[in-house]
A protein has these predicted regions:
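Conserved, structured core segments of small domains
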Residues: 1-122
């Protein structure tokens, strides 16, 4: 089964990581993410993942009564913000939680684990 790991932090890294070189050398609060990536990528667990840009670069899109409404910024204004995500394939929620617990950001941020749900088919 596929699971989404939402990688959340309370504050963005300072300065924000924007260039490919900065992202490639990212050291998470003294915790190098490369060993975790090697484990989950090498084990065929992680299907895809990425960091995402800071909340100030977000746009929120709604359609109400046929009209598109675009707002600058994220959907919710909170201290926590999504810094990235990973899509993993595991046998169970328990295994997905174990993988999330080993993510370096779990030591100072949080990892929300959500199972994928199939879309209804005609």
């Amino acid at each position: 089964m596929k699971y989404l790991l939402l990688v959340c932090v309370e504050e963005p890294p300072e300065p924000p990581l924007e260039t490919a070189e900065e992202i490639a050398s990212w050291d998470v609060e003294g915790e190098d993410i490369k060993p975790w990536l090697s484990e989950v990528d090498g084990g065929g667990i992680r299907l895809f993942g990425s960091q995402v840009s800071k909340p100030a670069n977000a746009s929120t899109v709604r359609v109400r009564d046929g009209e598109m409404i675009v707002s600058d910024g994220p959907f919710a204004e909170t201290k926590e913000w999504m810094a990235g995500f990973d899509i993993i394939e595991c046998d169970s929620m328990a295994q997905a939680i174990e993988i999330a617990a080993r993510h370096p950001v779990a030591k100072f941020g949080m990892i929300e684990v959500r199972p994928f749900r199939p879309l209804p088919r005609d």
